[in-house]
C-alpha cells in the first residue's frame, strides 16, 4: 500500500527516514485486532493473558508515537490533521503537509470493547488501569477509555484519536474543498 504522494519505499534523497502516519495507524489497528484475538484466547486459557498485556502495550506505544506533541509529531495542532513526518539526519523533523488519506487512516484504529470482553480478562483490565495511571499525558491525545468513559451498554472505545481531534479531522474530511 503506497498511498502517499511519492514512492515512500525508495530511499530519500535528503537522507533520514519517513515516519508514515498511515502505516503507523495500520499497526495500531493490527494491535487492536490482535488484542481482540488474545482476549478470546485468554477467556478459554489464562496462559494467553500475557498476550492481552502485550497488545495493549503495543497499542499504547504506537499511540504515543503518533500523538507525540511538538514539531516532531505526526499530529499538527494548528492544522488539526495527521501528516507523514520526515526525520532528517541532523535530528530535525518536517511534516509533509499534504492532505490525503494518510491523515485520515488514524480514524480506522478504533475498536469497541464490550463489557463482556472486559469481564473475561479482569487482570488485564487492572493492568490497563495501572498503565493509564502511569501515562496521563497519553490520555489527553487518544480517546479516553475506562470507568467514567463507557458508552451505551457499558461499551468502551479504544481509539488513537480523541473526540476533539476527531471533530477537527472530520471538518477537513467533510469539506469538499479539502480533498479533490
Spans of model-derived segments:
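Acidic, mature catalytic/reactive cores of soluble proteins
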Residues: 1-180
